Amino acid sequence: MKALVFHSPEKATFEQRDVPTPRPGEALVHIAYNSICGSDLSLYRGVWHGFGYPVVPGHEWSGTVVEINGANGHDQSLVGKNVVGDLTCACGNCAACGRGTPVLCENLQELGFTKDGACAEYMTIPVDNLRPLPDALSLRSACQVEPLAVALNAVSIAGVAPGDRVAVMGAGGIGLMLMQVARHLGGEVTVVSEPVAERRAVAGQLGATELCSAEPGQLAELVARRPELTPDVVLEASGYPAALQEAIEVVRPGGRIGLIGYRVEETGPMSPQHIAVKALTLRGSLGPGGRFDDAVELLAKGDDIAVEPLLSHEFGLADYATALDLALSRTNGNVRSFFNLRD
């Protein structure tokens, strides 16, 4: 099979590999589509956490089950079905798993980071991680189920409620999902902050009231000039410390900040006294948080969540270098580079 493999920072190869054999309780999936996430780019650059080289990246995917190893009693009902699946492979036995937080598993394995992921024609995955797709949801659109689940989890943790004014910082693939989920839940996205003009334009098309660049102080200046834009909730998706500091400054007293993006290579000064003085609530979220079923259902409805503006540039897997370069440069209107593995 064809596979993209990351071997070391900024060293990737397009290889022929044997089709993997599913272990008991695992399925073999024929991958259809996989999109490139910001975390994949950090992994490529070697500035991520909890991973090991060499690894096949990819965790935003869709595909078709071709085989199930039923030695542990799993039935074969998913064979031939189109599916998506959770990257989180938890042990089920540690204290974190016992608390119902498998994403914090002490023995966590993640597809595309510590286990080979979906940038290959075939991938193995625990059967319990799979979610079948309804006929109404195409494989192309379904590769965005995982980022939608991430957004649903994050917006829920941040407590967005009907009537809330919401600011979103960062309008990449996750940021654009966050703003759509916030609107779906009845929030008003008053402002989106994003450095790339084409991504700002997409945010405007998807319903943001106002747009601003992400230069330091721009969002604070806009909110000071237009107090009606002051957010009840800020969803910070860029991962930059300066952005978090600005979120603390612009959110209303008693407001809430959801931390979704993070960059392990970035550090910066903070003024945390404002958290206490303004009585703010900060909540971090990590991964899809068990929201795959909700994401599949919402995306299949086809009315509240638009994925086509996110799927901006399609590539065959052999063109991985161009796909990665475009995603890293964020030029030519790139929101998401994605691979069609059946073309």
Curated annotation (Swiss-Prot):
Keywords, comma-separated and alphabetical: Antibiotic biosynthesis, Metal-binding, NAD, NADP, Oxidoreductase, Zinc
Gene Ontology MF: a single term: metal ion binding
Chain residues that bind Zn(2+) 2: 91, 94, 97, 105
GO biological process, one term: antibiotic biosynthetic process
Annotated metabolic or biological route of this protein: Metabolic intermediate biosynthesis; 2-deoxystreptamine biosynthesis; 2-deoxystreptamine from D-glucose 6-phosphate: step 3/4; Antibiotic biosynthesis; kanamycin biosynthesis
Cofactor: Zn(2+)
Residues involved in Zn(2+) 1 binding: 37, 59, 146
InterPro entries: ADH-like_C, ADH-like_N, GroES-like_sf, NAD(P)-bd_dom_sf, PKS_ER, Zn_alcohol_dh
Domain of life of the native organism: Bacteria
Cofactor binding annotation: Binds 2 Zn(2+) ions per subunit.
Catalytic activity: 2-deoxy-scyllo-inosamine + NADP(+) = 3-amino-2,3-dideoxy-scyllo-inosose + NADPH + H(+); 2-deoxy-scyllo-inosamine + NAD(+) = 3-amino-2,3-dideoxy-scyllo-inosose + NADH + H(+)
EC code: 1.1.1.329
UniProt xrefs under SMART domains: PKS_ER
Enzyme class of the recorded protein, top EC level: oxidoreductase
Keyword Metal-binding: yes
Keyword NAD: yes
Entry similarity comment: Belongs to the zinc-containing alcohol dehydrogenase family. DOIA dehydrogenase subfamily.
Function: Catalyzes the oxidation of 2-deoxy-scyllo-inosamine (DOIA) with NAD(+) or NADP(+), forming 3-amino-2,3-dideoxy-scyllo-inosose (amino-DOI).
Name of this chain's protein: 2-deoxy-scyllo-inosamine dehydrogenase
Gene name for this UniProt entry: kanE
